[in-house]
Amino acid sequence: SETALDVKRMGKRPISVYWLAMATPTSGPSRSMTSEHRQNLVVEASWVIPVEPEGAVLQNHAVAISEDGTIAGVFPNANQPLDFSDWEHLYLPDQLLLPGLVNAHGHAAMTLLRGFADDLPLDTWLKEHIWPAEATFVDPDFVADGTTLAIAEMLSSGTTCMVDSYFFPDTVASTCLETGIRAQISLPVIKFPNAWAANEAEHITKALKVFDQFKSDRHRDAGITMAFAPHAPYTVTDNAFQKILMYSEQLDIPIHLHLHETESEVIDAVRENNQRPFARLSAMGFLSPGLQTVHMTEL
């Protein structure tokens, strides 16, 4: 393929990879996101993968990034426009430059629970280990610390945008603003009581409050967007699903949920509801471009 041929032309030299994280302007308080910490910059690399057009690998190219965080140009190192001659330059020989990666699903604060209970069936893992641990430990400080650690790990390995779904989403959003990472903050809804809310109704009420808190253009310009996050078909009732669908349409935000994650989930759903989880959501009108389904390993 074109991609394989281009990559082959890189030769056998060892290379490093740089991920290009585009900061965006904001009037918020975060020092990491203020314009005084940015400057006009040209990054020259041995290879640039722009993602679009698909399969393209540009050899000996540069990317110009203006101080407001936007890409001002992509051009050959040897043929740079005069407009960029007085910009700061960063030289990356034998290195590959590409856009930041996207973590499309996660629970960042749970980094603090890494290794807490491994290699268990999902139902056992959740009910006997994770949910009891969350009931004991999760609070705003736990979420702030765990999310900060996760963001540090993501940024250090090239992930510059994340989709997060966890309790205390207002804390998650504030932490993302402080660090400068882009994020979709998915507002959790689950029928079980937890440290964030007592029931589905309270989850939805709090979700709407968090949406109002972070819906401004200032937050969107800083890379923060929102979604509803009903946990999964087996942890959310039809009544709550219908309210979530109504609000998501009114507010024009997506819905993000676990679906068809395990074989037992599907078997249990058929036994209890006489239909598979996907069919249940379809019957309620959920299938649309705004639906984000994660895992989907048991179709």
Model-identified regions with their sequence ranges:
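Intrinsic low-complexity, disordered N-terminal segments enriched in polar/charged/small residues
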Residues: 1, 6-8, 13, 20
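N-terminal metal-binding scaffold of metallo-dependent hydrolase/deaminase domains
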Residues: 14, 18, 22-83, 96
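Divalent metal-coordination and catalytic microenvironments
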Residues: 46, 63, 69, 94, ...
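Short beta->alpha connector loops
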Residues: 48, 162-169, 234-235, 296-299
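Alpha-helical scaffold segments that flank or form the walls of functional sites
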Residues: 96, 114-181, 203-220
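Short, glycine/acidic-enriched loop or turn micro-motifs at the edges of active sites
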Residues: 106-108, 167, 261, 298
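Metal-coordinating catalytic core of metallo-dependent amide/deamination hydrolases
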Residues: 172-297
